[in-house]
Amino acid sequence: MRYLPRRNEYGISRCNVNDEEKWQMEQLPMVKTMEKQTESIQPSLVVNIGKGGQRDLAEAFADRHGVPITDRPGEALTLTFDKTGTSLSGYGLSYQGDFRNMLHRVTQGRLEHEMLVRAAKPEKKMGKCLRAIDATAGMGEDSFLLAAYGYEVTLFEQNPVVAALLKDAVRRARRNQELKEIANRMEVIQGDSIVYLSQLVEPVDVIYLDPMFPKRQKTGLVNKKLQLIQKLEAPCSSENELFDAALLAKPSKIIVKRPLKAPCLAGREPSYALNGKAIRYDCYTM
């Protein structure tokens, strides 16, 4: 019997439902409150509803965050809702999340060689469902790797624009035959993960942190598209608070992604680290 996730009252998966049942995520008041909070939005941002776009999503986003809707975005940073999904454009660049680009990393035996998967692999073989929280989701690529390995992942993204792009990417992935099994293990919440972690009752296996590092310089053609995202995301200014919230949540392990030569997050030395050519994963076992 294959098990599918059911969410408890704190949004964390419970793998105790057989595949003849359907589950729906319960929206608890705390999460609703987080979703309703108006986050800082780029002043020049506008919303555009293109042909075949989901008008209800576009209007709900514009109303919640006080962003104007326009048919002629011009040079402004534009969040477009059209038949292809949700995309961001501006500064001569455009970006839309697409997990199809990740398929080559999770097929043909490559997944086991991913550093993050090696860091997140349980030390003992477990029969239970693995659960993770990605507290700084961004566009969800790392969460996709965890979900491909078998984790039920709750992704938190505080920036409303990035969260809208991420939710759309997950929605489209769930309609893709090759991606849907992985995407069904990903649940996106727009809000402050510190608030969520401080109220978490049931511990998870992994809490993953990848706060934006202010000194990291990204180059290359692919990353030019991500420059749009970086214009919206601010470097983490509350590293101590974020790390303390993760500690208080009492996971089995905290994994922190860092540039190879960067100092440890909040000055906390890890239990061990996995080093790559440009990045490392600091692992804190509880």
Locate each region found by the language model.
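S-adenosyl-L-methionine
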Residues: 30-130, 159, 163-202
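Conserved SAM-binding motif I beta-strand of class I
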Residues: 152-157
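Mobile active-site "lid"/loop adjacent to the S-adenosyl-L-methionine
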Residues: 212-242
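Conserved Class I SAM-dependent methyltransferase catalytic core
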Residues: 239-285
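Conserved proline-anchored active-site loop of SAM-dependent methyltransferases
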Residues: 132-145, 204-220
